Structure formats: C-alpha cells, structure tokens
From Swiss-Prot:
GO annotation, cellular component aspect: cytoplasm
Protein species of origin: Bifidobacterium longum subsp. infantis (strain ATCC 15697 / DSM 20088 / JCM 1222 / NCTC 11817 / S12)
InterPro entries linked to this entry: DNA-binding_RecF, P-loop_NTPase, RecF/RecN/SMC_N, RecF_2
Subcellular locations according to the entry: Cytoplasm
Annotated protein name in UniProt: DNA replication and repair protein RecF
GO biological process, one term: DNA replication
Keywords: ATP-binding, Cytoplasm, DNA damage, DNA repair, DNA replication, DNA-binding, Nucleotide-binding, SOS response
Cited NCBIfam families: recf (TIGR00611)
Residues holding ATP: 30-37
Predominant localisation class: cytoplasm
Length: 412
C-alpha cells in the first residue's frame, strides 16, 4: 500500500498543493518554514484523525479560511486506487469521503491508511508531560480499537459538560443561589462520564498490553545487552484494573473528591488524566535515563506500534520520518534507516538533501519548488475542492495535472 498523490486545500501554510509520491523512499527537502512538516502531518491526520502537533483542529486550517481539505490517492497491493478525502472544519464535525461517495465522519476512515510517525518530539514520550503520551495512546487506539474515536469524542463532550456544571455549582455556592437543579444534572453527567470513561480506559489498557512485549524486545535489539525496559498503563480510573465492575468504586471516588472538584471547576479524575509508565531497570526513565536511552525508548515504542498495526490490520503502515535525523546520533540514525528501507512507503523530511544518506532509488521532492507558483496554469484545475468531480486526483480533461515532482499552488 502507498499514497500515490496527495492534495491539500487550505491546510496550514498550503493554500493549494498537489504532490506525487512513489512506493519506497520519498525525501522532501527544503529550508525550515516551507511546509515540509505540514505535508506529512496531513497524511498523519488522514490516517489517525489527529495530529501529534496539536489537540485542536483549528491550527490545521489556513488562516482566514473555515475549512481545510486533505485528499490522497492510495494504491493497494493489487493496484487498485482509492481516493480518501477529509474535510477539517473550524466549527462542526470533521467529515470524510471515499471515492467521492456519501459524506462520512472522519473517524469512519481512520485505519484505512495506517501510518506511524517518527518526529523530533518523540523524546517527550519519555521525558515530557502525560499529554504527549495520551496523544500517542489515542492515535494508537484509533488504529487498533474499532469505535475508539467515537468513544473518545463522546467522552470529551461529556467531560466538558460535567466541568461546566462544576463551575456553575461553584458560582451558585459563592452567590447563594439554589444548587439542587445543578446537582441533579451533575449526577446524571457523572454517570455518563463514568460509563464512557470505563470503556475508554479498557480500550487503552488493551492497546498498552499489545505494545508492551514488542516494545521491550525492540529496545533490547536496538540497545544491545543492558537494562530492561517495561511499558505499563497508568489509568486515572485505576479501579478498572482491579474490579470487573468498577462503576460503584469510581462513583465513591467521585463522592470523596466532590468538594475539590467544585472548588476548582474541573474533572479531577478520568481518562483525560491517564498516563503510561516507561521504566528502565524498574525506575521511571524520565527521572534518570540518558538522552540516548530516551531516544532509543521512543524509537522502540514507535517501532512496536508499527509492528502491532501491521500484524493486526494486515496492512503495511506508511512510515513518516519528520526531521528526525538531526536529533539522532550515527548509531540510531543507522538503525532507523535500516528499519525504513524495509517498508512499503517512507516519507522523510529534511532541511537539506544531504542530511539523509543517499538512497539510489529515492524519490526526491524539492519543497521550495512546490511552493512556487507554477509556470503553466492548467485552465481546468480550478479549486482543489472540484477534484472530487474527476475520476481520481490529478485527472483534468484527460490530462495529468502534475508530474512526479511538480505542483500547483495558488498563493493568496
């Protein structure tokens, strides 16, 4: 499986761009600020429904616009091409289409184009705050757990409503206003919060259990003989790991922390506070592991995710190496390059073409050239949103819109 063509419309810095990829290694090179990362991030969003760079969809949309569109032609091993389209909205639900068909939710196409991204921020999976690790859990579970994104979206909506009621209770208490109606509403939303939270927690627990063994094995292979690593789940609803039916215990927990929640106006427990533990020799790695050990753990974690997604979905994920080579020493650079050579498709971004060792068969894309207005404007190109009227991306009146390294971009 590989992406043969990617088209973006009002996505971050790109007003309009169409770029061709090939099976194997694709190297996107160019100075920082040209939009290399935005191109491969769009693949990540189409694949997982989210970006590791932001928890909000608003930054994904070009300034001054209300919608960003991502389209990709994806060729399977049998040579069949399918067009996937995602529409990212500043307001309202994000939508998707397959082969210009009926409108779907974005979550309905997650996993159709599996990908695993390696980024400069990966070290934060070990050293950073829990938010980075939750983002990875969400992206992994979106690929591996059917219905996960729908459950996550439902939980997020419930959590926001419950937090609003907690703030209202605090305000009513301070102003001497009645609280009975708000308390009744809080009880209802707390029940829904627990129900959705337990489902979410169990899904995440399953994903972490899948990753734990290959993570340890891959780390040992990368690092050689030495300390052992472990990966465990640290749910806020730890009752889920202790009881078959944890609802009563979680409800009691909420009763104990009720005063604190009202005082602060936030949900003090729940999946929004989950974490995962990465330990080296039985000690939290973030507390004492070296920079090199943290990078090796991060690489092992992403490689383990690749392995599990490949084995469970029966598809070879697209590998994204986004500006990682400057962060790695020679040994780890060689390890990740050896891993990349074995994959169906790899998208590599670098600041300079020489930053990555030579691949004889690599398809090289000069991002600076992509950013330049085309010398010839095809009269039938129009807005990229019109592409769905054609049989596939890149077909305009029977002509190919762009060749392997060219692009059409309209700069506003």
């Amino acid at each position: 499986m590989h992406i043969s063509r990617l088209a973006l419309d009002h996505y971050r810095s790109w007003s309009q761009v169409v770029v061709d990829f090939v099976p194997g290694v694709n190297i996107l090179f160019g100075k920082n600020g040209l939009g290399k990362t935005n191109l491969v991030e769009a693949v990540e969003v189409l694949s997982t429904g989210s970006s590791h760079r932001t928890s909000s969809t608003l930054p994904l949309i070009e300034r001054g616009q209300t919608t960003a569109t991502i389209r990709a032609n994806v060729a399977d091993d049998a040579g069949q091409t399918t067009t996937y389209e995602a529409s990212i909205h500043a307001r309202g639900a994000n939508r998707a289409r397959i082969n210009s068909g009926s409108s779907l939710y974005l979550r309905d196409i997650i996993g159709k184009i599996p990908s695993v991204s390696f980024t400069p921020e990966d070290q934060r999976l070990v050293s950073g705050d829990p938010g980075a690790r939750r983002t990875m859990m969400n992206q992994a579970a979106a690929l591996l757990e059917p219905g996960y994104m729908q459950t996550l979206q439902q939980f997020t909506r419930i959590a926001k409503q419950r937090a609003t009621l907690l703030k209202q209770l605090n305000a009513n208490a301070n102003n001497g206003q009645p609280m009975d109606a708000v308390l009744s509403g809080l009880e209802i939303w707390t029940g829904q919060f627990i129900e959705a939270g337990v489902v979410l927690t169990r899904m995440r627990a399953h994903v972490i259990s899948l990753l734990a063994e290959p993570f340890a094995a891959i780390y040992a292979d990368l690092a050689g003989a030495g300390e052992q690593v472990t990966l465990t789940y640290a749910p806020s609803f730890d009752e889920v790991l202790m009881f078959n039916d944890p609802h009563p215990q979680i409800s009691e927990h909420f009763q104990r922390i009720y005063p604190g929640e009202v005082a602060r106006g936030v949900n003090l427990i729940g999946p929004q506070r989950d974490d995962m533990n990465l330990d080296l020799a039985g000690i939290p790695a973030r507390e004492f592991a070296s920079n090199g050990e943290m990078w090796t753990m991060a690489l092992a974690l992403k490689m383990a995710l690749f392995e599990i997604v490949r084995d469970r979905l029966g598809l070879q994920p697209i590998v994204i190496l986004d500006d990682v080579f400057a962060q790695l020493d020679d040994s780890r650079r060689a390890q990740i390059l050896d891993f990349a050579r074995k994959q169906d498709q790899v998208l590599i971004t670098v600041a300079a073409e020489g930053d990555v060792p030579d691949y004889e068969s690599a398809h090289r894309i000069d991002v600076a050239a992509l950013a330049e207005p085309a010398s010839v404007i095809l009269p039938t190109l129009g807005n990229l949103s019109d592409l769905r009227e054609n049989e596939s991306l890149g077909k305009y009146d029977g002509k190919t819109a762009v060749d392997s390294a060219s692009v059409e971009r309209k700069v506003s």
